[in-house]
């Protein structure tokens, strides 16, 4: 079976990750300690994508939990799902990265990384046919961003032909934890562009908006935000975990979603999002789901896709949905919003179906889009980065850990290149595409010579 090894690093990564495990262990009929209590064979059929069977009907998540300080781990271990994880898979330091990317990537994190790789190797060896890795982390802090990206590049070295998906929480415009977020995020994006195959961009700001506007929560907690993220994560992987008519795995998703290797930063959305109070007043239908899924306010990435164009997008419907109805709806959507799709990639919307709905819903849909408007997100970070870097503010925290200013300059220019690549494809048309393509091929040949 196509197994996935899950790594969660840093405080944010661990909290998002534990919400994810809570969601999918519920979907597979496991109780809080991993004992199977479900009633459907479908739940067991592909349990081993994410779980190892321990014996005695107990299933253990194939998760590696990593942090540079013990606090988050202790909280997880004593939390409601603490008994779910394998105790050897908690790996933590005692020092904390202190929101410093350099500590996570070069000093503190580097000391711990071999230990982590050993555990990852052990998890990978217990798989029949490892499909890839997924990492949950934030890009604003020190551990998730610095050590998270270090792990990604180490795993890349060791497993070069496996997929690497990351769920990355971007620093948001309004909610800032630390003043050095722009540095940490830029340095991380610099790594993700090179080493990740698919990065699902999440954003606290967008998540807050959804909680307040759509779910009508007056003061959302991180628990509420993580619940939204776990719904998307569960939706993206559902076709691996349950049988369906159209299955997609991480690799198929990447093949369909990534037209150019560097442009693998996706916007995600989920439907139905209804407040608990109003959910009983509406029936969920396929048109309703599609409508809500393409609503820019329901995107979990703080970038408005209407300012850019979709290179590709993928939708996953779950529940008792008629294939034909979904295809008709998707066709309508593409016609209605045709100006938001690039016309030089025909059939750029891919649909997958799965017969198993999430807990408590009759049907649901997950949206993943590769939109050029994701550059807004990078642009925001880049502007803050430039403002601080021009004055060399806070740089001594990084150089003190052995980093060089050159690295910052490289990361900055890589991010600017990424933005201009997105912009280039946003403006490309069918006719001028040919010329541009030849030019690029020509460059490639010259470099090879």
Curated annotation (Swiss-Prot):
PROSITE patterns: TUBULIN, TUBULIN_B_AUTOREG. The modification Methylhistidine is found at residue 137. Mg(2+) binds at residue 69. Its main location: cytoplasm. GTP binds at residues 11, 69, 138, 142-144, 204, 226. Signal peptide: none annotated. Pfam families: Tubulin, Tubulin_C. GO terms for cellular component: cytoplasm; microtubule; tubulin complex. Keywords: Conidiation, Cytoplasm, Cytoskeleton, GTP-binding, Magnesium, Metal-binding, Methylation, Microtubule, Nucleotide-binding, Sporulation. SMART domains: Tubulin, Tubulin_C. Its cofactor is Mg(2+). GO terms for molecular function: GTP binding; GTPase activity; metal ion binding; structural constituent of cytoskeleton. It is found in: Cytoplasm, Cytoskeleton. One of its GO terms (biological process) is microtubule-based process. PANTHER family: TUBULIN (PTHR11588). Dimer of alpha and beta chains. A typical microtubule is a hollow water-filled tube with an outer diameter of 25 nm and an inner diameter of 15 nM. Alpha-beta heterodimers associate head-to-tail to form protofilaments running lengthwise along the microtubule wall with the beta-tubulin subunit facing the microtubule plus end conferring a structural polarity. Microtubules usually have 13 protofilaments but different protofilament numbers can be found in some organisms and specialized cells. Tubulin is the major constituent of microtubules, a cylinder consisting of laterally associated linear protofilaments composed of alpha- and beta-tubulin heterodimers. Microtubules grow by the addition of GTP-tubulin dimers to the microtubule end, where a stabilizing cap forms. Below the cap, tubulin dimers are in GDP-bound state, owing to GTPase activity of alpha-tubulin. Belongs to the tubulin family. E.nidulans has two beta-tubulin genes: benA and tubC; tubC is expressed exclusively during the events of asexual sporulation (conidiation). This is Tubulin beta-2 chain. It comes from Emericella nidulans (strain FGSC A4 / ATCC 38163 / CBS 112.46 / NRRL 194 / M139) (Aspergillus nidulans).
